Amino acid sequence: MEGGSSSSNGTSYLLAFGENNSGGLCPMTMMPLVTSHHAGHHPINPSNNNNVNTNCLFIPNCSNSTGTPSIMLHNNHNNNKTDDDDNNNNTGLGYYFMESDHHHHHHGNNNNNGSSSSSSSSAVKAKIMAHPHYHRLLAAYVNCQKVGAPPEVVARLEEACASAATMAGGDAAAGSSCIGEDPALDQFMEAYCEMLTKYEQELSKPLKEAMLFLQRIECQFKNLTISSSDFASNEGGDRNGSSEEDVDLHNMIDPQAEDRDLKGQLLRKYSGYLGSLKQEFMKKRKKGKLPKEARQQLLEWWNRHYKWPYPSESQKLALAESTGLDQKQINNWFINQRKRHWKPSEDMQFVVMDPSHPHYYMDNVLGNPFPMDLSHPML
């Protein structure tokens, strides 16, 4: 892979991880340099019409034979410039790193370009590796490469970064610098560290959003797989709710557990609450939406006592116990049923008004002296 600026007055840097023939990782990141007016008074020899790659920076430069991954900072600068172009355009920040070469371009010839470029690259490489922000720059670049990478690739990146930092620290220990000695180099390191940090943030943002979206979808699919049988198997014997004191260590939620185990732990811990909520929900059902079994029992009683469908209080208690309903629901059901489906006959209307039949009075609590399963001969 290669990169660089195709214009005559542009300077760009190419960051690469690993050597192509060393088995390392080789993603490339192309970034423009921040412009600076430093060293703008050094023109390049107009007689040199060849494009010369004046600066190759390796951070650090590991030999290919070792197979150790390395990080390379490559500056491809086009030197095909005239005196007018050099006077009319600002010089890029990377131009500072060729300052030691410019005198060779003024007074040398093409045979000296290779050696001067090599010496300049070594000098700039040493300056960058000795700068206090070098480890920050190295870590920022590796963090960009780690975004979205699988775990094994992340491990290799961290290993290579640590190896490169250790090697660079050993090579630059003798010539370490401090902030303020070289303002242009300080600006270069600060600008690229900030640029790489922002680049990592921009890369991470869509990845995090995608991961959150997938987690929500996965959670929704898991909720759909919970069947009613799972709740029924965990409701028995614990309908009155569970307290935190009743939960032992075995029922504590383990965040590292598998999805299936986590589902079982949640059901065991909160089955009592779920049972209570289900009972409360059943009580708050809409009127007329009684359970099918309860309505069937009420209809059977209605058919047996159709001539006088007014259950006594004891019969209402018996119906409430057998159907699981409360007396208010039973009263409402009988009231609605009589309004819609029952009209007393003329004989029954006369009997209601006859004092000789007190057990048919609607307001008489003890009106029906017979058990629930027996009927009066007149009924």
UniProtKB/Swiss-Prot annotation:
The record's Gene Ontology cellular component field reads: nucleus
Pfam families noted in UniProt: ELK, Homeobox_KN, KNOX1, KNOX2
Q: Care to name a GO molecular-function term for this sequence?
A: DNA binding
Q: Which keywords label this protein?
A: Activator, DNA-binding, Homeobox, Nucleus, Transcription, Transcription regulation
Q: What is its main location?
A: nucleus
Q: In which tissues is it expressed?
A: Expressed mainly in embryonic tissues. Weakly detected in stems and hypocotyl.
Q: Where in the cell is it found?
A: Nucleus
* Gene3D superfamilies per record: Homeodomain-like
UniProt-listed SMART domains: ELK, HOX, KNOX1, KNOX2
What residue spans carry the Low complexity bias annotation?
109-122
User: Does the keyword Transcription regulation belong to this entry?
Assistant: yes
Biological function: Possible transcription activator involved in early embryonic development. Probably binds to the DNA sequence 5'-TGAC-3'.
Q: Spell out the protein name for this chain.
A: Homeobox protein SBH1
The organism is Glycine max (Soybean)
